[in-house]
Amino acid sequence: SVLKPDGKNITTVLINATSSEWIGGKFSTPEEYGTQMLEALKLLMKAAGASKGAIVLRSDDAESIAAFSGIIFEGKQLEVAPLIGSRKIGYYFKDQGSDIVVVSQKRIYGKRILNFFTYNVTGKKVPVGCTPADVGVAICGVKSAKALYDAVYQGKPYYETVISLEGLAHCPSQVLVRIGTPFKDVIEACGGYPSESGKLIANGMRTGVAQYTDEVPVTKTTTRISFQKPEDVSRDEAI
């Protein structure tokens, strides 16, 4: 598993909260987001046998940063520290005198994103062909951390998720759907297809996968349903 990989010792657990705002994890308020993520991080650290943990926010997510900054944690007001230059989480563990810190950084895009994320947050370089676990780091997303919190503290199974829709001007930016719901049902519930739709994409435009049918279901890993305009679709001419 991610938390206890065979033959590897996890010393640090990271919750990657740079990919979406607090509402994307089914939280009622930013304050609830902060308190529940801290509790989830404790659970993850215990499961992994890790001594250190950090929640990584996106530097331009002002609402989430404000929510965490107002929390009283371990007897003092929590501070969200920026990852700048050589100041990685190791610096803030010592500076704040805590084994759990909350930091912020810009969102990272591209291939091997988790390896770059690990280096940017911890300063540990992940060798080519290896994973963060090889340098003692386990990474968990907000949705998985929220699901763990709900299961342990509320006895609630993971059967629904929040996804966003891109390319539908008349649709809410975030919708709560049951896992297994076909894409077409989500689209119809949000007012139907746009007048012109060139491509249906699961997840974002940058890293998503084009779908040949709207019968595909929403899964635990679905974060977005995107629509690309016909003029934006690249079509190579046949030779």
Q: What are these language model-derived features?
A:
Residues Y159-T161, F183, E188-I239:
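Ferredoxin-type iron-sulfur electron-transfer modules and their immediate structural context
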Residues E21-I23, A62-S64, C171-P172, K184-D185, ...:
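Flexible loop/turn segments at secondary-structure boundaries
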Residues P30-A48:
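Histidine-anchored nucleotide/phosphate-binding helix
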Residues S1-N16, E21-G25:
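Hydrophobic alpha-helical hairpins/lids featuring a short glycine-rich hinge
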Residues L3-K8, S51-F183, A189-P194:
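Hydrophobic alpha-helical positions that pack around
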Residues F27-E32, D60:
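Cofactor-cradling patches in redox/metallo enzymes
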